UniProtKB/Swiss-Prot annotation:
Record organism: Human herpesvirus 7 (strain JI) (HHV-7)
The protein's name: Major DNA-binding protein
Region (Required for nuclear localization): 1112-1131
Family: Belongs to the herpesviridae major DNA-binding protein family.
Gene this protein is translated from: DBP
Locations listed in the record: Host nucleus
GO molecular function terms noted in the UniProt entry: single-stranded DNA binding
Assembly description: Homooligomers. Forms double-helical filaments necessary for the formation of replication compartments within the host nucleus. Interacts with the origin-binding protein. Interacts with the helicase primase complex; this interaction stimulates primer synthesis activity of the helicase-primase complex. Interacts with the DNA polymerase. Interacts with the alkaline exonuclease; this interaction increases its nuclease processivity.
Lineage: Viruses, Duplodnaviria, Heunggongvirae, Peploviricota, Herviviricetes
GO biological process: DNA replication
Keyword DNA-binding recorded: yes
Length: 1131
């Protein structure tokens, strides 16, 4: 949506490419080494564009750059700088510290041959730039400096082709962080030569002598930008893509066809399409590729301002660090945190890295020979995983089938070639991913750790195909074996799936249980006159606020932090506190329903509610990470193509192609297509744009005399600078949404995923679980057994009298209360989320009660976040920390070597792990980078017949992404995982079809977790459940688990996890290595005898249930002679 009000801004007139010369300062080198992308055998290092690190503090990210010289008038264009810079000289100081991952350059070359990608070829007719001569001309020794280039989006093709002219005479001395640097402008060759004479293959004599041609930079651009863009646009001729981009920026050819004559159409033979379907698919492909290429350039060459993230010196972790060493430690931690998102993009089968295929998924319910409409075509064409069709035969512009030159790829499993393909065969990107894979957790599948141990021993044979036995501890071969079970499967079927992407979140988020329902508008609350004239709207949060105020007044929660703050002296006090809180919640629900009647709020308003959040689409939002800049461009290209499908399908259906050449048809339609697309994606519910107007389009400037400079002289002259375009659209954000209510249709009305099933819950699995665990010792001060064992014995009516439970009658009342609340809550629980604190208990109870009273009975979908944290790991599973090629003759020798290293001070390696975030909304207030699945749905307005977009939050496919995303093991049959939608987040506020049957991968940790949760849920354990958990967890382990592992096993029950970990530590202190149940029972002597007399709580239990265990007979929450307080307020 474009803003109704234009924003007027100004931008300086200067070139859009600069050469920076920095001193080789050790601290700067160490920081850049941590933040940059590099490959040990490549001289170019890709670094982030950050103020006070790689550019000066007052660097302008957007400029009016001179592009054409007409005598005394210069035409300028707006362009913004790419969020990366390229170090190309003096980089040996970086590379000597780089991790060796084997010969990735060779692997990338083989991948290009295998999958028909173009190879970069150095232009032998061009002279490479003499950087030593440039350094000398500015008074610097080339051996003592680092050189890097920053370039605008519009200038990247000029830089690639060596069509930029450095002007040493205009050198500027600037302060970059703590370093004094020199920057030299690079002007477009179009200012000195006729634009018609410029070409990436040939050049004039002036350009040959003066042009800045650095083949190593051109090579990086070729793969990092152009090959990657071509893959996403399904355009394999990278050189033609570069030529088209150069022509578009210089000659303003946005409204002409540039790519279609050279476009080929891949992935079609394997789809078994009819001739008409095939034609429709290719035509739509051509349209959306061309439109996206034109509009991406326009949107990137627009006005963008510096953001907080771009200022390196203002990062909290940099400002708070007292020493340089602390800065490096914090930056390394940040890099590890971000590896969670790298993992998701690599391991998710529906990742943006693999979604390069346009597929025709026909609607089987469509009648035979029925006419194809725009709607049916729009539903049929989808973006999907391309790995299964990388070297199939393809079609050309004349729709002729061309045989593939390379041999067919018979690999059904994900390999190093697929990974290199996902990286656009850019060695620096591939090296970065390998660095992350070397530090990711292993997910075992029945073989324990033997696979990685055996591989390390086999490395001594020096037969590695990637490194030839030079660096097997860190090479790509070892990395892929470590995480082999987590790699995505290559499916032969095409299916509609969301696309997983990593972006930066906006602050706005409306993501509570019912989202937009009952949320009073900001404008409405500010305009009392307008409010008086209309029916007031419901303010749901007013009633939640009443409950929060009650809690603060009664000291149930901390008034500032919102943390639990229950202060009670006895079980009766606790019961009274919770009873009073529940009464307060139910009164608030009653008032809310009364308010709904007054405001005429219907059930439909609830059912149509939306949860939503915004994602930042500005190019500088991910400037801190060159890798995520790489994926950012892919996201923008995919999103624009998805939006262009509406226009493309409409034109293909209404104006069919009758000739042979697709490009000829497209040329006839393109100007109309171009204009139609401009109006089709504004204000349509998904993409938000900002209209920007430049303050002045004509400026008088003292500027370089270009004609004089061409003759070898330098002088400044007064010129008139005219901006070729005054108003433009800028990328702002897009909105991702979710519908909490499942609206059944003909296909889903019997869907079991949302049908509420009545459950008999153990209190430790109910709504009070967090309180029972947290306050166990305070509730039962004399009790010597754990919370879990206590409740298991209560359920079994097997509590020995040798255990001091205090006053028996108080205990009976407390047990009765606990079961009553647990079962009452379960009857109305439509969210199926276990509260983790009082605030979440209040929110869930309020909404469950509200929806239950209104007559809702099915489960809702819910939003959840997994946030990254760093946890220690077993160093034996991380051979990268050996620092040298392994030469071990046996597994035992390797194990002993690692133990020796640990004894000599080797710290446990830290890796990123994901943990459930209790407050989903906090990831947006915490300014997070998030990874999520997105599916852009299109629907037609009944009134206007216009198409609108709905950015649907989707799933992340792939069992290897993270263990928290996988469904429960077979022992726990529920569909909760089908109703929960997850995003992966790292908070930076403090840092900155026919189904193919195949066996699902089950990881060892999931099997253990399933058994542990069965122990917790089971009502028939005859011994302390904590000991059963301990025995299950420690079985077949060669080291103790981390706290993070234990929290995963017990589903986040922190007190229980701590208790089990304390027992493990106690056993470790006693030097116990046998973790069988008999040993555990002998060590923990406080176990009671089964023959001891027991307390009789049988009157609280009733027999005869199907499962064979007791069900508590709870008293009704309302007396029979009283009318429920909520009944009067029902709609």
């Amino acid at each position: 949506m474009a803003d109704d009000n234009e924003t007027v801004v100004s931008a300086p007139i200067c070139t859009a490419a600069w050469l920076y010369i920095l001193p080789k300062e050790q601290k700067l080198i160490e920081i850049l080494t941590t933040l940059s992308l590099m490959e040990k055998r490549k001289s170019v290092v890709i670094s982030p564009l950050l103020l006070n690190l790689t550019v000066e503090n007052d660097f302008f990210p957007t400029v009016k750059t001179p592009i054409i010289n007409y005598g005394g008038t210069v035409i300028t264009k707006i362009t913004s700088f790419m969020p990366v810079c390229f170090f190309f000289h003096g980089t040996d100081v970086f590379l000597k510290e780089a991790e060796d991952h084997g010969n990735l350059d060779k692997l990338c070359k083989q991948t290009r041959e295998k999958f028909n990608l173009q190879e970069f070829v150095v232009n032998g007719n061009r002279k490479s730039v003499d950087i030593g001569k440039i350094c000398e001309s500015v008074g610097r020794n080339a051996d003592d400096v680092l050189c890097h280039i920053v370039v605008g989006n519009g200038f990247k093709e000029l830089l690639f082709a060596g069509l930029l002219i450095p002007c040493v005479e205009e050198q500027i001395q600037v302060q970059v962080g703590e370093c004094l640097a020199i920057k030299i402008p690079l002007y477009s060759a179009t200012l000195f030569e006729s634009e018609e004479t410029l070409c990436i293959d040939t050049c004039t004599e002036f350009i040959q002598e003066n042009g800045f041609y650095a083949p190593q930079i051109s090579e990086v651009l070729f793969y990092l930008i152009f090959t990657s863009w071509g893959m996403t646009l399904r355009f394999n001729n990278t050189l033609e893509l570069i030529k088209a981009g150069l022509k578009q920026f210089i000659q303003d050819t946005e409204q002409t066809v540039k790519l279609a004559p050279n476009k080929t159409y891949h992935g079609i033979p394997g789809q078994k399409l009819s001739p008409i379907e095939k034609d429709h698919l290719m035509l739509v492909d051509a349209v959306i590729t061309e439109l996206t290429f034109s509009y991406t350039a326009e949107y990137l060459d627009s006005i963008y301002e510096n953001n907080q993230i771009m200022n390196f010196s203002e990062w909290p972790i940099i400002k708070s660090a007292e020493t340089h060493e602390e800065k490096i430690v914090e930056l390394k931690k940040l890099r590890l945190h971000l590896s969670s998102h790298v993992a998701a993009l690599v391991f998710a089968a529906n990742s943006i890295l693999y979604s390069n295929k346009l597929a025709y998924i026909s609607n089987t319910k469509q009648a035979f020979n029925s006419a194809i409409t725009q709607e049916t075509l729009l539903r049929s064409i989808q973006f999907c995983n391309s790995l299964s069709s990388l070297n199939e035969d393809f079609y050309n512009d004349a729709r002729k089938l061309i045989k593939c030159n390379s041999s067919p790829c018979k690999e059904d499993k994900f390999s190093a070639f697929h990974l290199a393909y996902a990286c656009a065969t850019c060695p620096q990107i591939l090296s970065h991913i390998i660095w992350n894979l070397n530090r990711m957790s292993i997910y075992n599948t029945n073989c324990g750790n033997s696979e990685i141990y055996n591989h390390i021993v086999n490395c001594s044979s020096n037969l590695c195909e990637f490194c030839e036995g030079k660096c097997c501890h860190s090479c790509i071969g070892t990395a892929l074996i470590r995480i082999n079970s987590r790699l995505p499967q290559i499916s032969k079927t095409t299916k509609k799936e969301p696309i997983v992407m990593t972006m930066f979140s906006r602050f706005y988020a409306d993501v509570d249980v019912l989202g937009s329902f009952g949320k009073k508008g900001v404008n409405e609350s500010k305009d009392p006159m307008k409010e008086a004239q209309t029916t007031p709207s419901l303010d749901r949060f007013k009633f939640l606020g009443m409950i929060h105020d009650y809690c603060k007044k009664n000291n149930l929660i901390d008034a500032i932090t919102g943390e639990d703050n229950l202060n009670f002296k006895s079980q009766n006090d606790f019961v009274n506190m919770i009873n009073d809180l529940i009464q307060c919640i139910e009164e608030a629900v009653s008032k809310c329903i009364s308010e709904m009647r007054k405001t005429q709020t219907s059930r439909e308003q609830i059912e149509n509610c939306l949860q939503s959040f915004n994602i930042d689409t500005t190019p500088l939002s991910l400037a801190f990470s060159p890798f995520f800049v790489f994926t950012y461009y892919k996201v923008i290209l995919i999103v624009l193509q998805n939006l262009a499908l509406i226009i493309g399908t409409g034109y293909v259906v209404d104006r069919p192609c009758t000739g042979n050449l697709i490009s000829k048809w497209l040329m006839q339609q393109y100007q109309s297509l171009y204009g139609a697309f401009y109006n089709s994606h504004f204000k349509k519910g998904f993409l938000n744009m900002k209209t920007v107007k430049i303050a002045s389009n004509v400026d008088m400037e003292q500027y370089i005399d270009f004609n004089l400079f061409k003759s070898g002289k330098y002088a400044k002259t007064s010129i008139q600078a005219k901006l070729c375009r005054l108003s433009m659209q800028c990328l702002k954000d897009f909105r991702v949404k979710n519908r909490p209510f499942n609206k059944p249709n003909k296909n889903t009305q019997n869907n079991p995923f949302f049908k509420k099933v009545k459950q008999k819950k153990n209190p430790l699995s109910g709504c009070l679980s967090f309180l029972l665990f947290k306050y166990h010792e305070r509730l039962f001060p004399n009790l010597k057994i754990s919370c879990l064992e206590f409740w298991q014995r209560i359920l079994l009516n097997n509590m020995p009298k040798t255990i001091d439970i205090g006053n028996v009658e108080d205990m009976r009342s407390f047990i009765k209360f606990t079961f009553r609340v647990t079962n009452s809550y379960d009857e109305i629980d439509l969210l199926d989320i276990q509260p983790e604190c009082l605030l979440s208990f209040i929110e869930y109870y309020f909404h469950n009660k509200l929806l239950s009273v209104l007559g809702y009975r099915d489960y809702l979908t819910s939003l959840h976040a997994l946030t990254s944290k760093l946890v220690p790991q077993n160093p034996m599973l991380f051979p990268v920390f050996l620092k040298e090629h392994p030469t071990f003759s046996s597994v035992q020798e390797y194990v002993m070597h690692v133990k020796k290293l640990v004894g000599n001070g080797l710290k446990e390696p830290m890796t990123a792990s994901l943990t459930k975030e209790p407050n989903f909304g906090s990831i947006f207030t915490g300014r997070s980078i998030i990874t999520f699945g997105l599916m852009i749905e299109k629907f037609v307005s009944v009134a206007s017949r216009d198409y609108f977009h709905f950015g649907q939050l989707g799933w992340i496919a792939g069992s290897g992404v993270d263990r928290n995303l996988n469904p429960p093991s077979s022992g726990l049959q529920d569909f909760r995982f089908m109703r929960q939608k997850f995003v992966i987040a790292t908070k930076l506020c403090d840092i900155i079809v026919k189904k193919v049957k195949r066996e699902a991968i089950v990881y060892d940790v999931e099997v253990i977790r399933g058994k542990v949760l069965n122990i917790i849920e089971s009502l028939s354990n005859s011994v302390n459940p904590e000991l059963l958990i301990l025995a299950e967890v420690m079985k077949d382990r060669d080291s103790k688990p981390t706290m993070d592992d234990m929290l995963f096993y017990v589903d986040g029950r922190e007190p229980l996890a701590k208790s089990v970990m304390n027992k493990i530590q106690h056993l470790t202190d006693l030097n116990v290595h046998d973790f069988s149940l008999s040993t555990l029972l002998s060590v923990f002597e406080e176990q009671v005898e089964d023959s001891a007399a027991i307390y009789d709580f049988s009157e609280l239990l009733v027999e005869g249930n199907e499962q064979g265990f007791g069900i508590l007979k709870c008293e009704e929450t309302e007396h029979e002679n009283e009318e429920p307080s909520l009944k009067k307020a029902r709609l």
